[in-house]
């Protein structure tokens, strides 16, 4: 049984806005560049490079891009579930937004997940689940 399961993962430019919404899984977003505002519950966060947002299941959130002439919002995004109750609770306690001491490892793990997913070689899902699990454990430590 996987301790965590990736539902979707990608690196993209967001040039649209979404309204406050929630879902029944976690979502982790890393900001690579751009401007805008992320709303989590009633709290607005001005977007900064190398921020990480950890959105919990059923948590209201929205992403609004910056001005039309501003640099596009480039993000890393993974949507996932967590089966392990202890890890689930630890992730809930992390907080909505944080900065990592080394954002580079975060980007490298995302790139490995994306590359492995694109190739879909045998056992790729076990590998990407392992990468995500390592990311999550590093974050909650």
List each language-model region with its residue ranges.
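Amphipathic alpha-helical segments enriched in hydrophobic/aromatic residues interleaved with Lys/Arg
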Residues: 89-139
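N-terminal regulatory/effector-sensing and dimerization cores
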Residues: 8-93, 122-126
